[in-house]
Structures are given as C-alpha cells and as structure tokens.
Amino acid sequence: MKRLIALLFATLISAFFLSGQTLAADLQAGRDYKPINPPLPATKGKIEVLEFFSYGCPHCSDFHPMVSQWAAKQGKDVSFRRVPVSFNRPEWARLSRIYFALEATGDLAKLDTAVFIAIHEQRMNFKTDEAVVAWAAGKGIDAKKFGEALASFSMQSKVQRADQEATAARISGVPAIAVDGKYLVNNEAAGNYEELLKLTDAVIAKARQERGGK
C-alpha cells in the first residue's frame, strides 16, 4: 500500500511538472506575452516576477488579494516584487509614495490592503500628504515617522525609478506582470485574473526552462 501511494504521488508530481512544460511550449510571443527589448536587469539565481500596479487603479484593487495569495505559493526559485507606477500623474505619484513610505517604516503589511479599501470603498480623499498622514495615524501607526518618510526625497527618487522601470518594460496599463526581465504577460490573452495568473505560471515555466531548470 505504501509503495502504491508513493507511486501515485510521484505520478502526480511528474504530471504537474509536465503540465508546466507543456504550457510553456504552447506559448506564443505576441499572443501570450510580449518580449521586453532590451530586457530589464535580471536577478541572479531567481526568476523575478514584477507586478506593476497603482493604489489608484480599481482593477489592481480587485487583483490584489489573488496575486498576493499566488505570490505566497511560488517556489524558491521565484521572487516577487511590486512596482507602483504613476504614469506621470501627480495624484498617482502620491499613491506610489504611500507604498514606498509604508515599506520604509515597516507598516506595509499592516496597511497595504487598507489603502486599497480606503480609496475604492471608503472614497477617502488622499489629495494631500496631510490627509494621508491623518488617515494612517488613525490606523495606529506612528504619524511623525510615516509623515517624514512620505515627504522625504528618497521616496520621490523611488517613485521616479519605479516609473522608469515601467517605461523600460513598455507598461501601458496596470495591473501588468513582467517575468524574468524578458517577458510582459499579455493581459488580453486572459479572460480573467485567474487565467492571467495561470498564464504567468506558464511564462515562469518558460523562463525556468531557458535557465536550465525543470
């Protein structure tokens, strides 16, 4: 019985990896993904997946719970990084600064989802830094520390670098996913967010094969 269970388990694992390889083999450039040329700088040792997003984007708000769960289940050879973009819109640039400021103060895990809710469900007015800081203070974080981070030059620099990265990846809308610095997953090839993540899995499998992995 133990040998039978072990055999069944091995068969399932084999089928899982073969499925990923088959999906990768079925991918078509232009239809399922767009090559990023020139490629973005790649991380050594790991396949980096970038999610370009904005707190101001309602689609990003809907996508956030799903992509967060998906990212937590990725293998050790995959790293996940979020990139807030502004598309040179001042109101979105402030939202990008909110993300980086929360990250800098260690409060991102606590308030990340809350920012989406505040904007898209509670219709909070985040048109000034003062309004943002007052809201954050009401959520129990250090207002002085967060306010200083939000207004710092380093946050502005991070926003600029994030926008430059989005431009280099040829991002025209969000949410958008780039894989291994070389492939931009085509949202139009997916009918919904679940399919988008499955397509992303296939592109990751392609990148893994190209790196010599299985």
Question: What function would you assign to each model-found segment?
Answer:
Residues 45-46, 56-63, 88-95, 104-108, ...:
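Solvent-exposed, acidic/flexible segments
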Residues 5, 54, 138-214:
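C-terminal cap of thioredoxin/glutaredoxin-like
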Residues 56, 67, 71-75, 102-106, ...:
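Sec/Tat-exported extracytoplasmic proteins
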Residues 45-48, 76-79, 105-112, 142-143, ...:
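Loop/turn elements at helix/coil->beta-strand transitions in domains of secreted/extracellular proteins
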Residues 2-89, 205-214:
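Extracytoplasmic thiol/disulfide redox context detector
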Residues 64-71, 92-99, 112, 129, ...:
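Extracytoplasmic/secreted envelope proteins and their assembly/folding machinery
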Residues 43-45, 91, 168-172:
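Extracellular/periplasmic catalytic domains that process cell-envelope and extracellular macromolecules
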Residues 73-104, 110-136:
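Structural microenvironment flanking redox-active thiols in thiol-disulfide oxidoreductases
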